[in-house]
C-alpha cells in the first residue's frame, strides 16, 4: 500500500472511532431516559476499533491513534518516516468525525456544546471531579497497558486472527475504568476533535490528552523491547 492509501484508511478509521465512540456518548448514553450508559459507551469504543481492525488492518495497520503510532514506533514496529503522515491523517479524521457528530447532534432541539460533547477533562471538567495529577496518571497507565496488548497481540508469535478482539476488548475495559476519571482519552486524535468544537476549557486542557497517552505509549514500547531482548 502507498502512503496516500494508508493515510486515507487512517482518516476514515479515526472518523469512525470518534463518530461511533463519542457519538454513542453524545447521542445514546442517556436516551431515552436511561440510555446505553457507561457500559454501552465503553462497548461502542471497543467495537469501533474491532470493526475497523478487520476493515483496514491490512491496509494501514489500523492505528487510529497517534499514541498507538508512537508506541509501535518506540517498540521498533513502525518506521519514523511514516509517523507524521499517520498522525496528520488521524487528527484530521478525529476532527471530521466530531464534525459529522456535531451536524447530527445539533439537529436536536436543546442540544448544546456546553454539555461537553464527549470532551476529556480534569478538575471540574472530569466526570468524577478528579485532579489533573489523577487524570495524568490514569491516562499514562491506561495507554501503557493498551499498547502492551496491541504490541503483544500483533506479535508474530501470538495466535493469529485474535488481535482485533483482544484490542477491542482492552479498549472497552479501559473505558469502563476511566470514563469516570477523564472521560477516557488514551487517544490524542479522539480528544482533539470534540475539544475543537467545544473550545474554551476543552482546548486549554487538551495538552494533557496529548502528553499522557504518548508518554504511556512510549513506555509500553520500551517495555516491549525489553521483553524481546530477553528472548
Curated annotation (Swiss-Prot):
Cross-referenced Gene3D superfamilies: Glycerol uptake facilitator protein
Annotated site (Selectivity filter): 45, 175, 184, 190
Location in or out of the cell: Cell inner membrane
Chief location category: membrane
Cellular component annotations (GO), alphabetically ordered: plasma membrane
Residues of the site described as Involved in tetramerization or stability of the tetramer: 22
Taxonomy, superkingdom: Bacteria
Chain segments annotated as transmembrane: 11-31, 36-56, 84-104, 132-152, 161-181, 203-223
Cell membrane as UniProt keyword: yes
InterPro entries: Aquaporin-like, Aquaporin_transptr, Aquaporin_Z, MIP, MIP_CS
Protein's GO biological process: water transport
Membrane topology: Multi-pass membrane protein
Molecular-function GO term, any one: water channel activity
Keywords, alphabetical: Cell inner membrane, Cell membrane, Membrane, Repeat, Transmembrane, Transmembrane helix, Transport
Motif position, NPA 2: 187-189
Listed Pfam families: MIP
Record's catalysed reaction(s): H2O(in) = H2O(out)
Matches recorded under SUPFAM superfamilies: Aquaporin-like (SSF81338)
Short motif (NPA 1): ranges: 65-67
Subunit structure: Homotetramer.
Function: Channel that permits osmotically driven movement of water in both directions. It is involved in the osmoregulation and in the maintenance of cell turgor during volume expansion in rapidly growing cells. It mediates rapid entry or exit of water in response to abrupt changes in osmolarity.
Domain notes: Aquaporins contain two tandem repeats each containing three membrane-spanning domains and a pore-forming loop with the signature motif Asn-Pro-Ala (NPA).
Family: Belongs to the MIP/aquaporin (TC 1.A.8) family.
Annotated PANTHER family: AQUAPORIN TRANSPORTER, MIP17260P
Protein known as: Aquaporin Z
Source organism (scientific name): Shewanella oneidensis (strain ATCC 700550 / JCM 31522 / CIP 106686 / LMG 19005 / NCIMB 14063 / MR-1)
Amino acid at each position: 500500500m502507498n502512503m496516500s492509501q494508508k493515510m486515507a484508511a487512517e482518516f476514515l478509521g479515526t472518523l469512525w472511532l470518534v463518530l461511533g465512540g463519542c457519538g454513542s456518548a453524545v447521542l445514546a448514553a442517556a436516551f431515552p431516559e436511561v440510555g446505553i450508559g457507561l457500559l454501552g459507551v465503553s462497548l461502542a469504543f471497543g467495537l469501533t476499533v474491532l470493526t475497523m481492525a478487520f476493515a483496514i488492518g491490512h491496509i494501514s495497520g489500523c492505528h487510529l491513534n497517534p499514541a498507538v503510532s508512537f508506541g509501535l514506533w518506540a517498540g521498533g514496529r513502525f518506521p519514523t518516516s511514516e509517523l507524521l503522515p499517520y498522525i496528520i491523517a488521524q487528527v484530521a479524521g478525529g476532527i471530521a468525525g466530531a464534525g459529522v457528530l456535531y451536524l447530527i447532534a445539533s439537529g436536536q432541539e436543546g442540544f448544546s456544546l456546553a454539555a461537553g460533547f464527549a470532551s476529556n477533562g480534569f478538575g471540574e471538567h472530569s466526570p468524577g471531579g478528579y485532579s489533573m495529577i489523577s487524570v495524568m496518571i490514569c491516562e499514562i497507565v491506561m495507554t501503557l497497558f493498551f499498547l502492551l496488548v496491541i504490541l503483544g497481540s500483533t506479535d508474530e508469535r501470538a495466535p493469529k486472527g485474535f488481535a482485533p478482539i483482544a484490542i477491542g476488548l482492552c479498549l472497552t475495559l479501559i473505558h469502563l475504568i476511566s470514563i469516570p476519571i477523564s472521560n477516557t482519552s488514551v487517544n490524542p486524535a479522539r480528544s482533539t476533535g470534540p475539544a475543537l468544537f467545544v473550545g474554551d476549557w476543552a482546548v486549554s486542557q487538551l495538552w494533557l490528552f496529548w502528553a499522557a497517552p504518548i508518554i504511556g505509549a512510549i513506555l509500553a514500547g520500551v517495555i516491549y523491547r525489553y521483553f524481546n531482548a530477553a528472548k
